[in-house]
């Protein structure tokens, strides 16, 4: 007995087998719909920006022991 999953786009049953060409999708159409959703940014992975306000504050760099020219020394 093989595992059966739901297609993320149309919710039809998809057997999880080696010959399931588009798994977890039921068809190329559903796979391309999902790809288009990612390309148009309907789906995103939330991340914290490394450049949030205050992280590059010169006073914080001074507190960390960095001098202005430390970044360019050889």
Curated annotation (Swiss-Prot):
UniProt superkingdom: Bacteria
GO BP terms in the entry: regulation of DNA-templated transcription
Molecular function GO labels: DNA topoisomerase type II (double strand cut, ATP-hydrolyzing) inhibitor activity; zinc ion binding
Keywords: Metal-binding, Zinc
Cofactor(s) required, per the database record: Zn(2+)
Cofactor note: Binds 1 zinc ion.
UniProt keyword Metal-binding present: yes
Entry-linked Gene3D superfamilies: Erythroid Transcription Factor GATA-1, subunit A
Family: Belongs to the DNA gyrase inhibitor YacG family.
UniProt name for this protein: DNA gyrase inhibitor YacG
Species: Shewanella denitrificans (strain OS217 / ATCC BAA-1090 / DSM 15013)
Gene (UniProt): yacG
């Amino acid at each position: 007995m093989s595992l059966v999953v739901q297609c993320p786009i149309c919710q039809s049953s998809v057997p999880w087998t080696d010959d399931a060409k588009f798994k977890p999708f039921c068809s190329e159409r559903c796979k391309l719909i999902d790809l288009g959703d990612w390309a148009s940014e309907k789906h995103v992975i939330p991340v914290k920006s490394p450049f949030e306000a205050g992280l590059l504050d010169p006073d914080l760099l001074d507190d960390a022991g960095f001098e202005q020219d430390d970044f360019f020394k050889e």
